[in-house]
Structure formats: structure tokens, C-alpha cells
Amino acid sequence: MKIIIFTSSFLNDYMMKRFVVTLALCALAIFSVDAKKEKKLPKDIGAINERILEEGYHLYMQEKVAWIVEDVFFANQPEDSDNIGGWVPVTHDGQNVQGIFFNKEKTKVLFEVSINLETGETSSNATVRELTEDELKEISLRETVIGAVKTLDDLPAAPEGCSFNVNILKLEDDLYRVYWMLGTAQHNLIPFGCDFSYDCDSKGNIKESRKYHNSYIPAMLIMDGSPVEGIWHSHTQLSPFITPTDIALFLLYGYGNSPLTGFRVYSTVYGCYFHFDANSFQIIIIKE
């Protein structure tokens, strides 16, 4: 897993002295879990956490790329931007990514944004050209796997002030994990919750689906005019571990935008905290 080393002048102590409850989730019930019902952590918890970190990092990077691509597009909109039908990310190697904006007929590229992930440099090109065969395949694949969501029932709705962002991870040949997680333009807020994912093939056949949180968990970064010293929320059997979406959302909305360098998830199943430390990019298990 490739890790970007972040630098920060913020607090480095992950053992936070005070926490702010981010959701009224029957807090007393969280701590009244019968110890006899708590499960032991899996023997492969280290490997589980590594996979969570890796997927969380990829979700974060995909969202950052999307933000950059859209910012460049809106700052340099082509004259025929009304004919834009959508855009797709195209990765050429581990260092360079392009955002391809195509027309409604899905025949031509109207605008391109290029990003160097190592340097952060961006460039744009408004030269109209034909879509390549590979680009057409990418558009078709994304439409198919994202459209597969229509076959699922009882999905959470995006709360007011938020919308769903969709990110796709390729797990192996012809198997994709499609993440739906919240995004928001609201300031001083991390939009945890209402997220889910499913695994499907290139034809949109869903193999497995999972919900991470059933409800919206807005984590405020400012309370009573001051930055909060810590944030946490609880997970039940629905999702007993910290999630890739938790990690991605904290990196996007919390880390670097507040003094916070981490957050915690309390697992009612295992009776412990999973603490994500962004500076060291690791998950630390803290027993009560």
C-alpha cells in the first residue's frame, strides 16, 4: 500500500483527554453492553485493519482527485459546457490521472483535466476529440456498476445538505467494490453515516452488499465557538470495525481543517475503541 506522508503543525497526541459525542445514539446503551456478550477480536485483526486503511486511503484519493478535477473544470469551462454529459477518471499510471469530460451523446471529449499526484500540478485541455475505445469502456463500466444500486432495497437517503459520492475500487478481475458515501459543502462538519457498498461484476450482478451506518452522524468540528478536542461515534453489529468510509471522510473534512489528528469508533461488539491516527496512518486498538 502506498502511503502519502502528511505533515501537520497540529496536535500529535492521539490519547485525547476529552471527547465530544457526535450523535445522540442512546449513549448510555453503548456502555451498558454485557461484557459476556462481547466477542474477542479476530486473530487476523491486523490484516483486517490494513485492508480498511488501504481502502480508506483509496477512497480519500479518489475524492481528492474529483474535487481537483471539478475545481479546474469550473474555473476553465469550455464554451459548450452545456453539452457536458458527465466525466470519468482515467488512470494512466500510479502518478498521473485524467478527468475526461464527455458530451451527452458519449462520442467526444470536450474537456480534459490532468493531475500529477506526486507534484499536485494540474493542466487542462479544451481541444475537442473523439473518445477512445478504452474511455468508452470506462464510461460503460461505471454506468453499469453504479446503476446496479437500483437492485438493492432499504438503502439510506442522503440527509439535507449532503449528497452521495460514488467511488469504485477494483478488487480483482471482473470484481468491483462500489462505495456510496456522503459529501457536503457545509463547513466545520464531517458527514459520517448513511454509507454502504456492494461488490459486483462488470455486468452489474451484485455478489455482496453491506451497510456501514444506518443513520447520519454529523461530527461538528466547532462547538460553542471553539474547536472540539476529539470526536467519536459507536458501531454495532452492522459494522463492528472502523470503516474505510470513516477514514476517508476524516481525511477529507477533518484532518488539516481542524486541530484533530485522529478520531475513535467504539465497537459494541468487541468492547474496544478503534482509534485512527492520521499522522502515523494506523489504527490503534484501545480497550476500555
In which residue ranges do the predicted regions lie?
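Active-site-proximal loop/helix of nucleotide/amide-processing enzymes and allied scaffolds
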Residues: K37-L175, I217-E288
